[in-house]
Protein backbone atom coordinates (compact mmCIF):
# COMPACT_ATOMS: atom_id res chain seq x y z
CA UNK A 1 0.00 0.00 0.00
CA UNK A 2 0.98 3.63 -0.25
CA UNK A 3 -0.03 6.16 2.40
CA UNK A 4 1.45 8.86 0.16
CA UNK A 5 0.61 7.35 -3.21
CA UNK A 6 1.07 10.59 -5.14
CA UNK A 7 4.81 10.70 -4.40
CA UNK A 8 6.57 10.90 -7.76
CA UNK A 9 10.06 11.27 -9.17
CA UNK A 10 12.13 13.63 -11.30
CA UNK A 11 10.72 13.48 -14.84
CA UNK A 12 13.17 12.05 -17.36
CA UNK A 13 12.99 10.68 -20.89
CA UNK A 14 9.50 9.41 -21.63
CA UNK A 15 8.44 9.55 -17.98
CA UNK A 16 6.77 12.96 -18.09
CA UNK A 17 3.69 13.49 -15.97
CA UNK A 18 1.22 16.25 -15.08
CA UNK A 19 2.30 17.24 -11.57
CA UNK A 20 -0.41 17.58 -8.92
CA UNK A 21 2.16 19.33 -6.72
CA UNK A 22 5.95 19.48 -6.52
CA UNK A 23 7.18 15.96 -7.39
CA UNK A 24 3.67 14.57 -6.93
CA UNK A 25 1.11 13.21 -9.35
CA UNK A 26 -2.11 11.26 -9.12
CA UNK A 27 -1.17 9.38 -12.30
CA UNK A 28 -0.32 5.87 -11.10
CA UNK A 29 1.77 5.26 -14.20
CA UNK A 30 4.37 7.65 -12.82
CA UNK A 31 4.07 7.80 -9.03
CA UNK A 32 5.11 5.41 -6.25
CA UNK A 33 2.14 3.16 -7.06
CA UNK A 34 3.89 2.12 -10.27
CA UNK A 35 6.97 1.22 -8.22
CA UNK A 36 4.63 -0.80 -6.00
CA UNK A 37 3.38 -2.70 -9.05
CA UNK A 38 6.96 -3.75 -9.76
CA UNK A 39 7.54 -4.79 -6.14
CA UNK A 40 4.28 -6.76 -6.06
CA UNK A 41 5.24 -8.67 -9.20
CA UNK A 42 8.73 -9.36 -7.85
CA UNK A 43 7.47 -10.62 -4.47
CA UNK A 44 4.86 -12.76 -6.21
CA UNK A 45 7.69 -14.36 -8.18
CA UNK A 46 9.30 -15.15 -4.80
CA UNK A 47 6.14 -17.16 -3.98
CA UNK A 48 4.61 -14.63 -1.65
CA UNK A 49 0.88 -14.01 -1.92
CA UNK A 50 0.56 -10.27 -2.52
CA UNK A 51 -2.39 -7.90 -2.28
CA UNK A 52 -1.39 -4.51 -3.71
CA UNK A 53 -3.60 -1.66 -2.53
CA UNK A 54 -3.23 1.06 -5.20
CA UNK A 55 -5.56 3.55 -3.47
CA UNK A 56 -4.42 7.18 -3.31
CA UNK A 57 -4.80 8.19 0.34
CA UNK A 58 -3.07 11.60 0.17
CA UNK A 59 -5.38 13.34 -2.32
CA UNK A 60 -7.34 15.51 -2.32
CA UNK A 61 -6.03 16.11 1.22
CA UNK A 62 -2.52 15.23 2.41
CA UNK A 63 -3.62 15.79 6.00
CA UNK A 64 -5.11 12.64 7.49
CA UNK A 65 -3.54 10.28 4.96
CA UNK A 66 -2.19 7.99 7.70
CA UNK A 67 -5.62 7.85 9.32
CA UNK A 68 -7.14 6.78 6.01
CA UNK A 69 -4.48 4.20 5.21
CA UNK A 70 -4.64 2.89 8.77
CA UNK A 71 -8.38 2.36 8.48
CA UNK A 72 -7.75 0.45 5.26
CA UNK A 73 -5.22 -1.81 6.99
CA UNK A 74 -7.81 -2.61 9.65
CA UNK A 75 -10.33 -3.52 6.97
CA UNK A 76 -7.82 -5.77 5.20
CA UNK A 77 -6.95 -7.50 8.48
CA UNK A 78 -10.63 -8.17 9.09
CA UNK A 79 -11.04 -9.51 5.55
CA UNK A 80 -7.77 -11.46 5.46
CA UNK A 81 -6.92 -12.62 9.02
CA UNK A 82 -3.87 -14.51 7.73
CA UNK A 83 -2.22 -11.27 6.53
CA UNK A 84 1.30 -11.29 7.96
CA UNK A 85 3.25 -8.39 6.46
CA UNK A 86 2.07 -4.90 5.53
CA UNK A 87 4.47 -2.84 3.41
CA UNK A 88 3.89 0.89 3.11
CA UNK A 89 5.94 1.93 0.08
CA UNK A 90 7.18 5.52 -0.21
CA UNK A 91 9.89 7.58 -1.85
CA UNK A 92 12.05 9.86 0.26
CA UNK A 93 12.54 13.61 -0.18
CA UNK A 94 16.11 14.86 0.19
CA UNK A 95 16.55 18.58 -0.35
CA UNK A 96 18.35 21.59 1.08
CA UNK A 97 18.13 25.24 0.06
CA UNK A 98 15.99 24.37 -2.97
CA UNK A 99 18.54 21.76 -4.11
CA UNK A 100 17.03 18.31 -4.70
CA UNK A 101 19.28 15.32 -4.10
CA UNK A 102 19.11 11.73 -5.29
CA UNK A 103 20.32 8.46 -3.81
CA UNK A 104 22.58 6.34 -6.01
CA UNK A 105 23.60 2.70 -5.86
CA UNK A 106 26.42 1.99 -8.29
CA UNK A 107 25.82 -1.45 -9.78
CA UNK A 108 27.65 -3.33 -12.54
CA UNK A 109 24.82 -2.99 -15.06
CA UNK A 110 23.46 0.48 -14.31
CA UNK A 111 23.01 2.93 -11.48
CA UNK A 112 19.75 2.92 -9.56
CA UNK A 113 18.29 4.58 -6.50
CA UNK A 114 18.93 3.30 -3.01
CA UNK A 115 16.33 1.79 -0.69
CA UNK A 116 15.76 2.53 2.99
CA UNK A 117 13.78 0.61 5.61
CA UNK A 118 12.06 2.65 8.31
CA UNK A 119 10.90 1.16 11.62
CA UNK A 120 8.72 2.96 14.14
CA UNK A 121 9.23 2.48 17.88
CA UNK A 122 7.28 3.11 21.08
CA UNK A 123 9.45 6.11 22.01
CA UNK A 124 6.49 8.47 21.65
CA UNK A 125 4.71 6.66 24.48
CA UNK A 126 1.94 5.41 22.20
CA UNK A 127 0.91 1.77 22.06
CA UNK A 128 3.28 -0.06 19.72
CA UNK A 129 3.91 -3.68 20.73
CA UNK A 130 6.37 -5.93 18.94
CA UNK A 131 8.30 -3.08 17.34
CA UNK A 132 11.51 -4.98 18.10
CA UNK A 133 10.11 -7.88 16.08
CA UNK A 134 9.56 -5.51 13.15
CA UNK A 135 13.15 -4.33 13.52
CA UNK A 136 14.33 -7.93 13.28
CA UNK A 137 12.27 -8.33 10.10
CA UNK A 138 13.89 -5.22 8.67
CA UNK A 139 17.36 -6.48 9.59
CA UNK A 140 16.66 -9.84 7.91
CA UNK A 141 15.57 -8.11 4.71
CA UNK A 142 18.46 -5.63 4.87
CA UNK A 143 21.05 -8.38 5.31
CA UNK A 144 19.65 -10.39 2.42
CA UNK A 145 19.77 -7.43 0.05
CA UNK A 146 23.22 -6.23 1.15
CA UNK A 147 24.63 -9.70 0.55
CA UNK A 148 23.53 -9.51 -3.08
CA UNK A 149 23.90 -5.75 -3.65
CA UNK A 150 26.17 -4.11 -1.05
CA UNK A 151 25.44 -0.51 -2.09
CA UNK A 152 21.67 -0.77 -2.61
CA UNK A 153 20.54 -0.20 0.97
CA UNK A 154 20.73 2.92 3.10
CA UNK A 155 20.98 2.38 6.88
CA UNK A 156 17.79 1.30 8.64
CA UNK A 157 16.09 4.32 10.23
CA UNK A 158 14.38 4.14 13.63
CA UNK A 159 11.78 6.82 14.39
CA UNK A 160 9.60 7.72 17.37
CA UNK A 161 6.37 7.69 15.37
CA UNK A 162 4.33 4.53 14.73
CA UNK A 163 3.17 5.28 11.18
CA UNK A 164 0.46 2.59 11.51
CA UNK A 165 3.07 -0.11 12.14
CA UNK A 166 1.40 -0.94 15.45
CA UNK A 167 -1.52 -2.47 13.55
CA UNK A 168 0.34 -5.67 12.59
CA UNK A 169 3.32 -7.68 13.80
CA UNK A 170 4.95 -7.53 10.36
CA UNK A 171 4.80 -3.93 9.18
CA UNK A 172 7.55 -2.20 7.20
CA UNK A 173 7.95 1.21 5.63
CA UNK A 174 10.15 1.11 2.55
CA UNK A 175 11.51 4.31 1.01
CA UNK A 176 12.63 3.82 -2.61
CA UNK A 177 14.90 6.59 -3.85
CA UNK A 178 14.09 10.25 -3.38
CA UNK A 179 12.38 12.99 -5.35
CA UNK A 180 15.67 13.57 -7.17
CA UNK A 181 15.69 10.08 -8.64
CA UNK A 182 13.94 9.07 -11.85
CA UNK A 183 11.16 6.52 -12.06
CA UNK A 184 13.48 4.15 -13.94
CA UNK A 185 16.06 4.33 -11.15
CA UNK A 186 13.38 3.59 -8.56
CA UNK A 187 11.83 0.64 -10.41
CA UNK A 188 15.26 -0.87 -11.02
CA UNK A 189 16.05 -0.56 -7.31
CA UNK A 190 12.79 -2.03 -6.05
CA UNK A 191 13.10 -4.99 -8.40
CA UNK A 192 16.55 -5.80 -7.03
CA UNK A 193 15.27 -5.30 -3.49
CA UNK A 194 12.33 -7.64 -4.04
CA UNK A 195 14.44 -10.32 -5.69
CA UNK A 196 16.81 -10.39 -2.70
CA UNK A 197 14.46 -9.64 0.20
CA UNK A 198 11.54 -11.72 -1.12
CA UNK A 199 12.93 -15.12 -0.09
CA UNK A 200 13.85 -13.76 3.35
CA UNK A 201 10.32 -12.38 3.84
CA UNK A 202 8.84 -15.65 2.57
CA UNK A 203 10.72 -17.56 5.26
CA UNK A 204 9.36 -15.22 7.93
CA UNK A 205 5.73 -15.85 6.99
CA UNK A 206 6.01 -19.64 6.83
Q: Where on the chain are the PLM-derived regions?
A:
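A short, glycine/acidic-enriched catalytic loop
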Residues: 17-23, 94-130
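Loop/turn elements at helix/coil->beta-strand transitions in domains of secreted/extracellular proteins
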Residues: 45-49, 81-85, 113-114, 151-152, ...
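N-terminal catalytic or cofactor-binding beta/alpha core of small enzyme domains
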Residues: 1-84, 93-99, 191, 201-206
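Structural recognition of the beta-strand scaffold that forms the well-ordered cores
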Residues: 1-2, 50-52, 85-88, 116-119, ...
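Active-site-adjacent substrate-binding region
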Residues: 130-157
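Solvent-exposed loop/turn segments at secondary-structure junctions
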Residues: 5-8, 56-60, 91-96, 122-125, ...
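Active-site-adjacent mobile loop/cap segments within catalytic or ligand-binding domains
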Residues: 153-206
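Alpha-helical scaffolding within the catalytic cores
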Residues: 73, 98-105, 157-162
Amino acid sequence: MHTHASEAFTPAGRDLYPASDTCRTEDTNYNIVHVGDVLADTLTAARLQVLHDRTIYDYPSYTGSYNRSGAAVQEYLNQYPSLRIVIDLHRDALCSDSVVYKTVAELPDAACSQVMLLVGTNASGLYHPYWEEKLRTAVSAQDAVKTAHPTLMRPITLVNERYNQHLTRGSLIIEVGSSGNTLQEATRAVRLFGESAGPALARLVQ
